[in-house]
């Protein structure tokens, strides 16, 4: 199953990369406003670059008092003022990361004893991270055929949450034994990268009983992506590259530890930061090792394929 999906993915990448047009990129929620704000706020001058937004006669969304009031990242990205405010706040947080997660950990504690994962959004309120939305997975641990005995959040649920503007998106790893420690799975990483590389959110959190971990992307990676003529194509290539590297390394290294994972991610400009500090997770407890299985790899590829097939469909219709 994995090899078949990989063959199809390779074909799609080669096929789609030659056909992505201005209209397709715009339909994929990549707008000129986002490109301008990201590059302008980082003193980068680029000629050409990502596609301009194609108007279809619809009026732009009404301005909001604060960027968190927009209903989607697509709407927010069309407001230059609001998106600039978001990007400024995001950079301040990523550059310092002096955050107190006590309120979040206290609020999430009762959910960690549930028989399923939860996901939601976190915003900064009066300088403190606060949960503004939290919803449960429809699956109890063991109810999904792809994830065996593990708990999981379906892609459609996670996307529904992550597509709304927020400073952070999170999901829980409940107290269900060895499969649900604080270490992010390869699936967690490849899914969240699609949002982080867009510059959407400062980080994606994995909250467990022993830690708050945050996946975040170096600002330079995002700038380089948006300076490219086809940022969505480059994004797909980068996600696939990271996925393949993690999968191959995971098959060679046993036991697989957080230290191994962090080193690989850092080579790609991605950080997995443990709060209150990286020293908080200094041991390598076998109970917290995430064991990759074939169905995990298939699920990740399946989601990426769906994303790429959507682009292919739109390309063929233009």
From Swiss-Prot:
Origin superkingdom: Viruses
Keyword entries, A-Z: Late protein, Virion
GO CC term (a single one): virion component
Upregulation: Expressed in the late phase of the viral replicative cycle.
Subcellular compartments: Virion
Main location: virion
Similarity-based family: Belongs to the asfivirus F317L family.
Protein name: Uncharacterized protein F317L
Organism from which the protein derives: African swine fever virus (isolate Tick/Malawi/Lil 20-1/1983) (ASFV)
